[in-house]
Amino acid sequence: MYIDTASDIIEQTVSGFNTTIFAYGQTSSGKTHTMYGTASETGVIGMAVEQLFHAVEETPDRRFLMNVSYMEIYNEMVNDLLCDSKSRPAGGLKVRENEEGFYVEDLIQKTVTSAEEIHRYLLCTIRLYS
């Protein structure tokens, strides 16, 4: 499934495009399992992160700035998953539009330089939402 869906998105990212990997479905339909995977089977996020950093290493003639955000839309509310649940706004975050396109106001973005950093952020969210 990863090769058919997310692999091309990572190639576009390395080419300079802003990209998003988005999981959609009913509650308990397997979105979290598909995205995170298990201890023995890497999920979409893990494979994408590894592919991204491998591609960066293979492109030494370019400089990359990588930011990571992680959010969910649940019951029509946008929640920042990199934010402690206690400090989230009660009504969720707002989706806005400007001349550059759509964005989520106040969504945390973390600058990252390694796959390990992203995995640490994800581990924090797994602990908060498990």
Spans of features found by a protein language model:
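Microtubule-binding structural modules
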Residues: 1-130
